[in-house]
Amino acid sequence: MNSDRTTLRRAHARDAVDAADVWLRSFSAALPTVRRAHDDDEVRDWFATVVVPRQETWVAVAAGSVVGVLVLDGEELAQLYLDPPWRGRGLGDRFVRLAQRRRPSGLSLWTFQINGPARRFYERHGFAAVERTDGLGNEEREPDVRYVWPSPPL
């Protein structure tokens, strides 16, 4: 599975369920100890009624299947999830470069503190951790960390 064989394109309404399913599989694989705040059907409904129609949503498509999803909400990189077999193949890098091109003035994002691979990934792409919380402000009640790009001056 080479990321060069994937197409990145804006999501259409018909992609909502497939994008949500990528989110569900990726979340479960990457964060097995984190309690999800919503069941599968609620996540699919959220993608269909909020994420795809109201936010700048991109999908990665390989052989006709959605294998990744990127969501930009204003200056926030709100979602970046890959089907587990597609991790480590450069697709996430392509999504981050796309987000940086789309928001050259800067991006911010939140990820869970427990998600070391995601944190290292964003740090490799020039994001800097600027805030940590105890998680009481997110639905999962999981300690999180806010990243910004470009990194603020020291």
Go through each PLM region and give its residues.
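A short, internal acetyl-CoA/4′-phosphopantetheine-binding micro-motif in the GNAT/acyltransferase core
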Residues: 76-87, 111-112
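Conserved beta-strand in the GNAT
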Residues: 59, 65-81
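A short helix-loop-beta-strand connector motif used in the catalytic cores of GNAT acetyltransferases and
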Residues: 48-59, 76
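Short, low-complexity, intrinsically disordered N-terminal peptides in bacterial proteins
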Residues: 1-7, 151-154
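A short beta-loop-alpha structural element at the N-terminal edge
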Residues: 7-21
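C-terminal "cap" of GNAT-fold acetyltransferases
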Residues: 105-119, 124-125, 130-154
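Conserved acetyl-CoA-binding loop-helix of GNAT-fold acetyltransferases
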Residues: 82, 88-101, 120, 124
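Conserved GNAT-fold acetyl-CoA-binding loop/helix
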Residues: 20-49
